[in-house]
Amino acid sequence: MEYKPKFHMTVEQNIFVAKRNIVDYIWKSARLEGINVTFPQTYAIIEKSRVNGVDVEDILKITNLKHAWQYVFDSIGKPMNLDFLCNLHSEVARDEALMWGKLRTGNFFISGTSYVPPIPKADEVQSAIQRLLTIPDPTERSIEIMLWGMKSQLFWDGNKRNSMLAANKIMIENGCGIISVPNECLEKFNEILCDYYTNDTLEQAKEFVYEHCIDGIDFTEQQDDEEDEDLTPDM
């Protein structure tokens, strides 16, 4: 299967899309982690408004995601390497994980699968990143880096969030859109992810993400349509 870019935006346009929909992306990331929070509650937390019915730990995770996204925006155009992943994790899992910003140093089990990820070694992680960065197509490269990060479980916690944000750095830098799992696909995504962990079904996982989990805007097509209708773009 080919993983040609679904969207062809400039970096600035892709950043605009990400910032415009940031609450939605953070909300969906929270839901992916099993946080039972509504969109209005997520918005209130991000805006530092008073919110009821959400655990303090969950508020922290959502706030950390906000800071992590800002770190991604600030890192556009900078190298993708182990230092970036660790610095990103410092934002994703601050005051939440056993350690943040440092590679996992012990074994643990992943719920729903018999797969036990090996303890990561810095040199092997950096080699894997360099190998993945050679994938020619940026969309495929982003998806593979995300799935690799999730399966590798580089950190004690926050691996899904960290891996998806790292993938979105590459997506944005290439104007390819944003990877985000829709709520209606959460159950299926987790099922496919568990199968990937257990049976190494990488292609199946890649295809699902490509078909169902990429968001964006085709600005060129939209602008052409508006010009045909003699309308002024509302931008």
Short names for language-model regions:
Residues M1-M235:
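FIC/Doc superfamily catalytic core
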